């Protein structure tokens, strides 16, 4: 009888618990007159409808909000993005970590603002898992800001849209003092891995011209599993167990460029597959397209195969969205790159080329920590303590490297002074699982869970 009751009430219970998906949530819609707002303006805000997720448990933090922010697409057309702001217990209003999660999908319902909420769909599990990477930032007392940088069209791997969204999210956060208590002159570090590195890297490269006023706030950017050439990522993943990434790259670019989409549509052997590319978040794409041949072999999805990249329109679009080709865009803030030599998603050649381009242009500070024994997925874990160490040093006003430094290590667990950050990760993970408060100097009477279940 008990099981029958549970079976009958489960749909009702689930309806109460689950956050609303962006595609049917009116909060994500641009309000009337939004085009007249300035980029970075907060158009509306709310508490996150559900608690921030820790996977199977909610995070115990002080507060969390969603902002609807005025931004723009790759062509300068006005649009809106949603950004999530998380306040830890005993937060430091002078420090912000802008953490770009690796959404790596071309569907609105995969957006970080949705995926970071407790109860979000299992298809967003890869994004949910990144809360364990950002948890130590909260434990240090930093506000964490995470934008839906792909924008309302879900333009995965589209550089300009993504970078501008990150910068406008930071602008909004710095204006949010009356809501969040963040100081207007707060210092900001950007960090992203995989798709999040693409957005963060573009933000750093665009910032001197697009958001020059942020120079007084930005302390640097950490880039892991750094994607700088989208064609190389498609080449590396097509006809492999990671072919879902190739699908999502093509779908994301098609969402921003109608002419790109039209060329793909007219070249397809399997329209049913192409038309469903945007139906999946990353986890689903991996499962759905394992071993898929979009451009390889006889039974490929696109007739032209790799020759499609010789099409002048396609070639220009993919190069316009590859940071490795943008030699005129040079960050003026310190840069930290950590990357596995065995990366299966973003082969290390292109991050190295981007590093060299920036060095040749005279960048003031860039550090490349190459990990000999790890690939894309393992480096996201192994390299994270090195990135955290670098970020803590920047917030502590320690000087970054002068000029360019590329160091190859057996593993980035050998990064200097990394041991304390490794312990920070273990502590934060245990705090998440035990639903302990995330933040510095927490007293026992502050451990009540701030839940929006």
Curated annotation (Swiss-Prot):
The disulfide bonds in this chain are 110-281, 359-404
Q: Which UniProt keywords apply?
A: Disulfide bond, Glycoprotein, Hydrolase, Lipid degradation, Lipid metabolism, Secreted, Signal, Virulence
List the Pfam families: LIP (PF03583)
Q: Where is the signal peptide?
A: 1-14
Q: Which residues are glycosylated?
A: 36, 229, 266, 269, 417
Q: What induces it?
A: Expression is not induced in medium containing Tween 40 as the sole source of carbon. Expression is up-regulated during the yeast-to-hyphal transition. Expressed during experimental infection of mice. During host infection, expressed in gastric tissues, but not in infected oral tissues.
InterPro entries assigned? AB_hydrolase_fold, Lipase_secreted
| KW Lipid metabolism (keyword) present | yes
Q: What's an example of a GO molecular-function annotation for this chain? A: triacylglycerol lipase activity
GO biological process entries: lipid catabolic process
Q: Where in the cell is it found?
A: Secreted
Write down the chemical reaction(s) this protein catalyses. Answer: a triacylglycerol + H2O = a diacylglycerol + a fatty acid + H(+)
Q: Which family does it belong to?
A: Belongs to the AB hydrolase superfamily. Lipase family. Class Lip subfamily.
Which PANTHER family does the annotation name? LIPASE 5, PTHR34853
Q: What does this protein do?
A: Secreted lipase that is able to hydrolyze both the neutral triacylglycerols and the monopalmitate ester Tween 40, allowing the use of hydrolyzed products as carbon sources. Has broad lipolytic activity, which may be important for colonization and subsequent infection, therefore contributing to the persistence and virulence in human tissue.
Its name, as the record gives it, is Lipase 9
Q: Which organism is it from?
A: Candida albicans (strain SC5314 / ATCC MYA-2876)
């Amino acid at each position: 009888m008990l099981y029958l009751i549970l079976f009958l009430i489960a749909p009702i219970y689930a309806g109460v618990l689950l956050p609303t998906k962006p595609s049917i949530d009116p909060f994500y819609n641009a309000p009337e007159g939004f085009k007249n707002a300035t980029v970075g303006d907060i158009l509306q805000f709310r508490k996150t409808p559900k608690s921030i997720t820790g996977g199977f448990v909610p995070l115990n933090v002080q507060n969390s909000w969603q902002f609807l922010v005025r931004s723009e697409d790759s062509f300068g057309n006005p649009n809106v993005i949603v950004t999530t702001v998380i306040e830890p217990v005993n937060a430091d209003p002078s420090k912000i970590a802008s953490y770009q999660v690796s959404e790596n999908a071309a569907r609105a319902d995969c957006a970080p603002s949705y995926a970071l909420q407790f109860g979000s769909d299992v298809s967003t599990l890869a994004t949910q898992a990144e809360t364990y990477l950002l948890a130590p930032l909260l434990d240090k007392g930093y506000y964490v800001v995470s934008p839906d940088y792909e924008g309302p069209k879900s333009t995965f791997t589209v550089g300009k849209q993504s970078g501008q969204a990150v910068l406008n999210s930071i602008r909004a956060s710095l204006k949010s003092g009356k809501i969040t208590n963040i100081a207007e002159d707060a210092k900001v570090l950007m960090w992203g891995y995989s798709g999040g590195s693409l957005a963060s890297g573009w933000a750093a490269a665009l910032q001197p011209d697009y958001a020059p006023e942020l120079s007084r706030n930005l302390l640097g950017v950490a880039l892991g599993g750094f994607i700088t050439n989208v064609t190389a990522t498609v080449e590396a993943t097509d006809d492999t167990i990671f072919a879902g990434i190739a699908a999502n790259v093509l779908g994301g670019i098609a969402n921003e460029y109608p002419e790109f989409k039209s060329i793909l549509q007219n070249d397809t052997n399997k329209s049913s597959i192409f038309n469903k590319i945007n139906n999946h978040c990353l986890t689903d794409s991996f499962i759905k397209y394992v071993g898929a041949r979009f451009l390889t072999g006889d039974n490929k999805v696109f007739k032209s195969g790799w020759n499609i990249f010789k099409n002048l329109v396609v070639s220009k679009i993919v190069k316009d969205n590859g940071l490795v080709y943008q030699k005129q865009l040079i960050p003026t803030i310190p840069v930290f790159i950590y990357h596995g030599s065995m990366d299966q998603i973003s082969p290390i050649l292109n991050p190295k080329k981007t590093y060299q381009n920036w060095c040749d242009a005279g960048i003031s500070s860039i550090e490349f920590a190459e990990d000999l024994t790890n690939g894309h997925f393992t480096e996201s874990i192994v390299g994270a303590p090195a990135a955290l160490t670098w970020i803590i040093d920047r917030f502590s006003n320690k000087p970054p490297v002068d000029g360019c430094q590329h160091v190859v290590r057996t593993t980035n667990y050998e990064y200097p002074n990394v041991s304390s950050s490794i312990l920070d990760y273990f502590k934060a993970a245990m705090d998440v699982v035990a639903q302990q408060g995330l933040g510095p100097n927490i007293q026992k009477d502050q451990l009540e869970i701030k839940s929006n279940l």
